[in-house]
């Protein structure tokens, strides 16, 4: 196998830009990526990130999706006690098609900054495969880093698209079907799978949403770009205490994260929605359409 040619240095492990502001809470806002999707449903969500019960960050995400296209954007910032020792903010966005019963991303962009250090990523995809990439800053080469081969960059999702679950068909979205999947993520530096398994269904209530949530257990499975000898990689690979709670986005077949819980070495990291404002958007009918 050969390493895929890139427009930037070979992807490597994520730097400390506050973990690009803690994953996808730390995301979004680049909406000028090619024109709006034809939206049948829209979600405006706000989240808070805590570790061991201590607030570290807040963020917001907007999703618009129709039958054939979707776009996701969001932003986040460091808050709480962490602001006394660190600063950080980030924006990210993704857009793509809905085809073959799944999300097929086309573009992804991330801009993050922490303590004066910037991190950027730009991915362009076609038919689920990576075509172009720019990532800054590059990391120093490491002999034990698993190389990223072209074969593992097929049928991938960017981190924003991978944070949402698409349930095809017309059946009940609030069922075990929401968890019956493995999510293949590539963030420009690492390729990994998130294997979901159904656990249970809970009742939740937050501003804008009151109803059921499907709870999935999650296993982190590194594929490429990681360093197997690193303790954090070993810890996360063996971590059996990761879960995501999913709720439906009105007017779509998308499921959004209500809560993400990850056991860490310093306490449980909890990303939880403080509001989930979801609405169905009626299609516009031309004035000359048949009546």
Model regions and ranges:
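Sec-dependent N-terminal signal peptides
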Residues: 16-26
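Extracytoplasmic beta-rich ectodomain segments of secreted or membrane-anchored proteins
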Residues: 151-188
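Internal, conserved structured core segments that host functional sites
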Residues: 112-160
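Acidic, serine/threonine-rich low-complexity disordered tracts
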Residues: 39-127, 173-291
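N-terminal secretory signal peptides that target proteins for export/translocation
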Residues: 1-16
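Local alpha-helix boundary/kink/capping signal
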Residues: 25-28, 263
């Amino acid at each position: 196998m050969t390493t895929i040619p890139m427009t930037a240095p070979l992807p490597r492990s994520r730097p400390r830009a506050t973990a690009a502001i803690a994953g996808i809470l730390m995301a979004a806002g680049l909406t000028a990526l090619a024109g709006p999707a034809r939206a049948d449903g829209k979600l405006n969500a706000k989240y808070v990130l805590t570790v061991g019960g201590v607030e570290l960050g807040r963020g917001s995400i907007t999703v618009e999706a129709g039958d054939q296209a979707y776009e996701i954007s969001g932003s986040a910032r460091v808050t709480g006690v962490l602001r006394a020792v660190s600063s950080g903010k980030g924006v990210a966005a993704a857009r793509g098609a809905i085809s073959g019963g799944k999300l097929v991303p086309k573009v992804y962009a991330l801009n993050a900054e922490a303590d004066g250090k910037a991190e950027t990523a730009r991915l362009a995809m076609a038919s689920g495969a990576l075509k172009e990439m720019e990532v800054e800053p590059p990391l120093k080469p490491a002999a034990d880093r698993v190389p990223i081969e072209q074969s593992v960059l097929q049928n991938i999702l960017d981190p924003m698209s991978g944070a949402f679950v698409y349930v095809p068909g017309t059946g009940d979205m609030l069922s075990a079907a929401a968890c019956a999947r493995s999510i293949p993520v590539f963030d420009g530096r690492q390729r990994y799978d998130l294997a979901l398994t159904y656990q249970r269904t809970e009742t939740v209530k937050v501003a804008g949403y009151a109803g059921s949530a499907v709870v999935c257990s999650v296993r982190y499975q590194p594929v490429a770009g990681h360093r197997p000898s690193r303790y954090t990689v070993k810890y996360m690979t063996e971590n059996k205490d990761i879960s995501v709670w999913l709720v439906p986005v009105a007017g779509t077949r998308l499921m959004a994260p209500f809560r993400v819980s990850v056991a860490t070495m310093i306490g449980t990291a909890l990303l939880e929605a403080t509001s989930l404002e979801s609405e169905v958007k009626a299609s516009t009918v031309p004035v000359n359409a048949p009546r």
